[in-house]
């Protein structure tokens, strides 16, 4: 675990599908986290001096310790679809990063000057807070997945440290060793003053020199480092966020493409050779992934702690920053000056460099404001006062606004592992800047291609329009001939129609005359017919009246005869009725006599019956008295029942 944390190897072989961040970024963050953890643990100790403050500017670019120590270049594959598939942190990682930033942002950064007041910092923080979240999202979209290819690091003896490097293992493979923190020496300002004018250009042979292997740490140091690393896990995630936001802010150089590796030496921080882009464009047209070899940059330190106002204005003009940018983003004022190429360039190179600086300016302005707001927004979140180390005269050059390495050291430690961390961070930033410039160039090429495609489409549309006009003219001529033919045909049709109309009119006149004649004959025929019908009806009516009169006469004679017969029958019926009445009266009288006789006989029978009933009652009384003296009913022999009189 400790070997992986403090390894000097820049990258291991990892699949980009298995992780969203490269091993290079993980190792860089681990090294920075370990250093900041040690500084935080020793922040409250009383045995440190302001002279022991270690910053990136204290290391000379041309010192004897650094002249023979060269990092081996790493190839970073850039896929063609990196813009479309840019990695984004997951929800859990983003949440953890935001929580860690709120706790450790102030510890990892130092103020730009000792004279800055808390009120000014609060003003800057208040202005930058509303836009921090949106800028974080924009920075997260610009992170690009890189697939590093591991390289074998040969072992070379270091003359600056004076110690022998560890050899290869028995199996022949190189095993990365951690950097001991007690090996580096602190560079003095006198060395920087002696060698300020050393040339900043490095050839590919110098840049690709192997890195010496450093001896491993002892067991106790590894245990303490593991303990500090486990306690500061949140700080690692916060540094990841600040690293991604500040990596766009610096403008280092020193990255070349594989095609231009043998042709062009590496320029200063802002210089870009034209052969790089020629090779990159050829690789992009071939559709293959581009390998960008990043080399060790030169880190420049200002000679004095404070820079004059004229020098600051010149550096701002060279770096492409304006006063408005510096006022809106306070962290740009404390960032190192931008170095411009001193050698004269050709017109083609100048045009290419101008285009690249414009692209860098837009990227730096956008990301620097986001990183500045992130760092200043955490100043208000500190509830209690914390002990601060004095601000250094110089600021770090490798991560822009991330000031993890600008804190005081409690004890004198070796500076060579810290120097390796600085170099690693600078290499990563140079690679990232080159990659961003390359992507901007690809965007420009795509825009040019789209513009060419648009022009071709417009030309095609114009050709189609001309063809359409020509076809329209041909169609128009053909249509005129067709119209003449149709007009002649219409005239012929109208002539024939007029002739047929005249013939029809003549026929119609003849038909009207014939109709008038037929009408007169018809009227005469109808008059004769009506006269005959009237005469026939008159004769018929007369005959009917005569028949009715005869019928009426016959009916009268028949009625008289019927009335006579009716009167005779009525008289006969009256006589019969009188006879019937007499018979009924006789029957009634006979019935009355019979009723009287029956009543008298009934009365006699009733008296006889009553008499007989009285006799029977007397006999019953006599029999009941006799029957009361009879024997009792039978009972079983087992029981004896008393006799009762019923």
UniProtKB/Swiss-Prot annotation:
Region of interest (Disordered), ranges: 75-226, 242-418, 491-511, 531-554, 570-597, 609-646
PANTHER family (alphabetical): MICROTUBULE-ASSOCIATED PROTEIN 9
Coiled-coil features, chain-numbered ranges: 442-596
Domain of life: Eukaryota
Biased composition (Polar residues): 105-119, 157-167, 205-222, 280-291, 330-340, 386-398, 637-646
Protein name per its UniProtKB record: Microtubule-associated protein 9
Residues where N-acetylserine is found: 2
Functional description taken from the UniProt entry: Involved in organization of the bipolar mitotic spindle. Required for bipolar spindle assembly, mitosis progression and cytokinesis. May act by stabilizing interphase microtubules.
Protein's GO biological process: mitotic cytokinesis; mitotic spindle assembly; regulation of mitotic centrosome separation; regulation of mitotic cytokinesis; regulation of mitotic spindle organization
Compartments where found: Cytoplasm; Cytoplasm, Cytoskeleton; Cytoplasm, Cytoskeleton, Spindle
Biased composition (Basic and acidic residues): 188-204, 346-357, 405-418
Gene name per UniProt: Map9
GO MF: microtubule binding
